[in-house]
Every structure is written in structure tokens, then in C-alpha cells.
Amino acid sequence: MSEHETTGEGRFSSIEIRVLGSLIEKQATSPETYPLTLNALVLACNQKTSREPVMNLSPGQVGQALRALEGQEMARLQMGSRADRWEQRVDKALELVPAQLVLMGLMFLRGPQTLNELLTRSNRLHDFEDVDQVQHQLERLISRGLALHLPRQAGQREDRYTHALGDPAQIEEILAARQQEGGGRSAGGSVSEERIEALEARIAALEARLAQLEG
């Protein structure tokens, strides 16, 4: 499967994830220019700051991702007299409150992050009082199969959190890499088989939910 193809069972490619994250971010930080034109969205996707990894997407790639997302009701085109513009529909499609939308957007743009990183990076997007509020919303997302909790590994001081809407193969790669990172530690410090099974169950539940939304 190429990078720009939509994944099956309601999953999203890395480009689609970047598009959604960029729309969510600009909705909060640049309301005067939101919804975004295609050119503005390409620039947002290719930013060299607040993006991990940095990408170099073409208008064609972003446009194809938008059409795929529109088909899954995750983005919507607003036709205008001067230019067509795009808006995200993640909050509507997944029934997210603003705090949850912001966290999903940050994880879309930068992948696995600690509670403190999410708190710091959300300061322009949402007013979280402390890390406890961040954790509470993440736990709600995890309970719905929309996010994953990744226990800390060797050389790390904190657990990390990431979204669960990407390609299942990519999620499995993250989990496998974290297992390998923890291979030099005791068995109690690595990701357990039970936790991996639980995460896979959450992924399956999310796929079923997204399939219902598409139907």
C-alpha cells in the first residue's frame, strides 16, 4: 500500500492523519483564515515546527487525502466565490469534546507524547489546568479505543500516549519497537503480552465503531 492510500476498516494513512491534525490546529490558532484553502493546508502540513515527522506533501497528495476524508465524513469542503476551503469534522464524526479534539490533533501531528508534552503543547489550543485534566481526557479517549497508552521504556522517565486511528500495521510497529527498546530490561519493565492484546482489542473496537459511522 502506498503512503497516500486510505487504509481499510476506517483507518487513515499518514498523510490523512497529517491533514486532520493540521486542520484541527489551524482551527484553534488561525480562526481568521479557517477553513483552509488547499494551498494553506499544504503549507500547514509541511510546517517544519510542531510536526513529527516533517513531511513534504504536494497539493495533489493533500487533495487526494481530503477527498478520502470527505468520503468518511472526517472533512468537509466549503465552496466559495473566491476559493474553496476545507474544514475538519473529526469532532462531529467521533463525538469529541473540545479538549479531546485538541489532544487528538496534537497526537496526529507529533505521534507519541508524554502528559507534560501534551500539556505544554496544548497551551495555544485549549486551557487545561494541569496534567490531571489531560490524563482524564486521554483516559476517556483510550476507553473508546481512540488513543493508546504506551508504558515508558528504557531511558524514558514517563509513559507516552498516541492516537489509534492510523494504519494498524504502523501501530503494531510502534508497539514492537517499544518492546525491543525494553528488551534489555527485566520482563516487568517491558510491554506485556496482556497489554498488547488489550491494545489490539481496542483497535478492533475502534474499527467496528468507524465502520458503523461510515455505514
Swiss-Prot record:
Mind telling me which SUPFAM superfamilies this protein's record contains? Winged helix' DNA-binding domain
Q: Which Gene3D superfamilies match?
A: Winged helix-like DNA-binding domain superfamily/Winged helix DNA-binding domain
Give the Pfam families listed for this entry. DUF480 (PF04337)
Q: Which domain of life is it from?
A: Bacteria
**In which family does this protein belong, per the annotation?**
Belongs to the UPF0502 family.
Q: What is this protein called?
A: UPF0502 protein PSEEN2299
